[in-house]
Amino acid sequence: MPGAVDFKERISRQRPHDRETYGHAGNTDLQDIVYQLESDRGRIVNSAAVRRLQQKTQVFPLERNAAVRSRLTHSLEVQQTGRFIVRTLFRQLGPRAAEVGLDGLEGALESLVEMACLMHDVGNPPFGHFGEYAINDWFERNLDALFERRIPPGQGDGLLQQRMLTDLKHFEGNAQAIRLVVKLLRLNLTYTQTAGLLKYVRPAYEPKPDKAAANHYLNKKPGFYLSEEAFVDELRRVLGMRPGTRHPVAYIMEAADDISYCLADIEDSVEKGILDIRQLADLLVKKFAVHHSPDAPIPGDADNMSFQRMVDYSLEKAEREPINKVSEFFIRLRVKMIHPLVQHAAQQFIDNFEAVHAGTLGRALMEDGSLPHAIVQTFKDVAMEWVFCHPEVETLELQGYRIIQGLLDFYAPLLRLPAEEFQALAEGRQAAAPHPQLLVRRLPSQQIKAYLEAMKGVAEDPLQRQWEFYHRCRMLQDFVSGMTDQHAQDEYRALSAL
């Protein structure tokens, strides 16, 4: 075990808005750290962002069948898997935990991982990843002309303007989660808890690196926006993290998500009638054979079963079940699969402790070419080929695209107003034509207040006009991305007079 690694360096009780000041990475009072993390749990569990997940898409938008997963039920499953990984990690480490500074941290790490898992999807817009595409597509087509109308060519800072344009054209759910926690909900979580959400490490205005680049994995998506860059810089300072690195908690959260959703999406497809369990069993074995031998024993399985035998065993148990064959199939399959996958994730954390501690491991814990990796990839392959491209899913995604594009079209007049007029409206003063007044009144007060608060921060900035328009665009993205699927559909219908 690497003696130079000390996980306690990455844990601090410090918060952005603290009455007390702590030193670098803070504080070795473990009892107080656990107490502060309990406060984080309360803030997160009681937040509106978590409640909204119950009406946001996992795979099937606007789903009425409560047995099919929403983002909330998915996040609860990820939370449980994350907890299981942490407990398995400490069981596998045993007394060696002290060698890497993990002694006494089981409760703290468990809470950090659980809450990172629960929050990992809060930044996702309505209609899932297709919703992200719809927002970015609208801004790609409209933003340059809107920006030029407010900031004519030759005025302002050219480099800053280019960064702002690129930033706004790359909306991403992970980056939005950071913004939501820090600027919109103002949860004032410990820096350590928020760091667990930083799955990707580059600002949205920086280009995506080539796949061959050493830093590609951690930078393949935006991790935060220009508007939160100062916060992320301070987070890194407090936790002793170098730029371009991840917090160790993010690796466990990611592994828990990978393990949970790959099987859950398949189960939902059976619940929806897209596949039956016999079809699924055949597909799983065929797809697994592409990556690995289906007859090879799976490490960590108590019965030394192969993938083929696990699938057959689950099918046999389901056939004997007189009432709910589908449920029995997935219960058996999940129990047989989850244990070896969780053990593998925990062992990968241990085997790569130096890189995980430094935040430089350039892959997911489950992506190592191993047999457990083949299991996860098999489920993803089946979901990609048989679930995500199903006509029902694609039709709902197209409807979601039209809804989000339509909402942005409806509210675009607010981006065409002069800065003075929009600020007057945001402050509650009558300073524009009736149409934009009515639009502003439909915006949540929370998002208007976040805009006004951002404007206070640039009141004396010579580039205030650029920042004002940037924050106005952010506010519109906050508004649309914060909607549930149903709210977005209702708002679209209302403004379309349907």
From Swiss-Prot:
Q: Name one GO biological process term.
A: dGTP catabolic process
Give the Enzyme Commission number.
3.1.5.1
Q: Which UniProt keywords apply?
A: Hydrolase, Magnesium
What is its EC class?
A: hydrolase
Q: Which GO terms describe its molecular function?
A: dGTPase activity; magnesium ion binding
Cofactor section: Mg(2+)
Catalysed transformations (reactions): dGTP + H2O = 2'-deoxyguanosine + triphosphate + H(+)
**Record's function text:** dGTPase preferentially hydrolyzes dGTP over the other canonical NTPs.
List, alphabetically, the NCBIfam families matched. Answer: dGTP_triPase, PRK04926.1
The family note in this entry says: Belongs to the dGTPase family. Type 1 subfamily.
Q: What is this protein called?
A: Probable deoxyguanosinetriphosphate triphosphohydrolase
User: Could you tell me which species this protein originates from?
Assistant: Pseudomonas aeruginosa (strain ATCC 15692 / DSM 22644 / CIP 104116 / JCM 14847 / LMG 12228 / 1C / PRS 101 / PAO1)
Upper taxonomic lineage: Bacteria, Pseudomonadati, Pseudomonadota, Gammaproteobacteria, Pseudomonadales
